[in-house]
Amino acid sequence: AIAVELARDVFEAIQTLSRGSVFQDMPLVSNKELMDLR
């Protein structure tokens, strides 16, 4: 559970920092990776 929460925090931080950048094309992949952690 802790790992999932950590991943969520990191994911949110990356999304916030990289808006308008290359990561804009990768949200679906990142979401899939988060789902796999559960």
Curated annotation (Swiss-Prot):
Keyword annotations from UniProtKB, A to Z: Antibiotic, Antimicrobial, Bacteriocin
Temperature dependence: Thermostable. Retains activity up to 100 degrees Celsius, and when exposed to 121 degrees Celsius. Also retains activity after storage at 4 degrees Celsius for 4 months.
GO annotation (BP), single: disruption of plasma membrane integrity in another organism
Biophysicochemical property: pH dependence: Optimum pH is between 2 to 4. Active from pH 2 to 6.
Reported regulation of activity: The antimicrobial activity of BAC79 was completely lost after treatment with enzymes trypsin, pepsin, proteinase-K, and carboxypeptidase, while there was no loss of activity with either amylase or lipase.
Keyword Iron-sulfur annotated: no
Biological function: Has antibacterial activity against a wide spectrum of Gram-positive and Gram-negative bacteria, including L.monocytogenes which is inhibited through disruption of the cell membrane.
Protein name in UniProt: Bacteriocin BAC79
Organism, scientific name: Weissella confusa (Lactobacillus confusus)
